[in-house]
Amino acid sequence: MKLSVFTSVLLAGLVAAQQEKLPKCAQPCVDQYTTGGGVAGCGQLDIKCICSNKNFLSGIACCLEKECDAQGKETAVKYAKQICATAGVTDLPDDVTCDKSAASSGTASGTATGATTPTSSDSTNTASATGGSSTVEPNAGAREGAAGFIGVGMAMLLAL
């Protein structure tokens, strides 16, 4: 029990210290790709997975391009490079570049079933479709792309 409390206090201190390095403009971008159980489809503490996730990185870059000024972007890049280097990922871009084609791609899935019923002998048919659904994952398009590496470090901040 004491170990859990100690670990929680230690992690809270680390998060607070690291948040000072994260530009405020980047926080909405990080929030967009962070869930309770992970970051962009990776485990919360799987830094290598997050830093290597190209579409996710592109999506974060597009968000940062909209949200941050030049200083904020520079700070976010530096922070992300530091975090990713700890996992051995060093092939990150030096600046924020939004690859809209990678960031806007997504996945969609759905099913539709139909039934036709003749309504008269003159071959007039009535069709009805039921059960159609479509699900678009907003984070899926952001999971693999080259330019948005910045969000990795920021996402790790929230994951801690």
UniProtKB/Swiss-Prot annotation:
Location(s), subcellular: Cell membrane; Cell septum; Cytoplasm; Secreted
Pfam families, per database record: CFEM
Domain text: The CFEM domain mediates interactions with host proteins.
Membrane topology: Lipid-anchor; GPI-anchor
Lineage: Eukaryota, Fungi, Dikarya, Ascomycota, Pezizomycotina
Residue span, CFEM domain: 18-111
Functional note: Suppresses host programmed cell death during infection by binding to Z.mays WAK17 isoform 2 and Z.mays LRR5, to prevent activation of Z.mays WAK17 isoform 1 and the downstream hypersensitive response.
Keywords, ordered alphabetically: Cell membrane, Cytoplasm, Disulfide bond, Glycoprotein, GPI-anchor, Heme, Iron, Lipoprotein, Membrane, Metal-binding, Secreted, Signal
Domain of life: Eukaryota
GO BP term, pick one: effector-mediated suppression of host innate immune response
Family: Belongs to the RBT5 family.
InterPro entries: CFEM_domain, Extracellular_membr_CFEM_dom
Propeptide: 140-160
Name of this protein: Effector CFEMN1
